[in-house]
A protein has these predicted regions:
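Short acidic low-complexity segments
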Residues: 24-33
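Charged, amphipathic alpha-helical segments and their flanking helix caps
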Residues: 1-24, 44-142
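A short, hydrophobic beta-strand-centered structural micro-motif
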Residues: 34-42
Length: 142
């Protein structure tokens, strides 16, 4: 599921910002091209629910490395506003998932945009064996 969400985030970023912004999800090389995004999943968790249902919580950090060093804050604020809009709903397997607890931080001249995606999953439990045959004797009373 993490990879599906990561792909959906990448698609939403590409739709919003276009092809001139590189999107990375693996280690960034030293000579990476700016402007770019780096996406990482932080501390996924799972909570038990009724039956075979589980709530998985995925926190993503979308880091933005700006191109313009002169108007740095202006560019970072502008990108952050766009991220609030494009990360609210992402499309996974023709379903929409809503981003929650969105917030942004500017640290070391780059933007960290945090968003949670919570998803219910169903796990198949052990299957019970079925009886092969059953014989029923029925008598009617009068």
């Amino acid at each position: 599921m993490i990879n599906k969400i990561l792909d959906a985030i990448s698609n939403a970023l590409n739709e919003e910002f276009g092809d001139e912004y590189e999107i990375y999800s693996e280690d960034i090389k030293q000579d990476f091209k700016e402007p770019c995004f780096f996406i990482i999943c932080l501390n996924p968790s799972e909570q038990d629910f009724l039956g075979n249902r589980y709530l998985r919580k995925y926190l993503f950090d979308i880091q933005y490395f700006p191109k313009n060093k002169k108007n740095l804050n202006s560019e970072l604020y502008s990108v952050q506003e766009k991220l609030f809009n494009c990360m609210e709903y992402i499309n996974i397997d023709e379903d929409l998932i809503r981003g929650l607890k969105m917030r942004g931080e500017i640290v070391d001249k780059k933007l960290h945009f945090f968003v949670n995606y919570n998803v219910f999953v169903f796990k198949k439990g052990p299957q019970d064996e079925f009886m092969e045959n059953i014989k029923i004797n029925m008598k009617t009373r009068r």
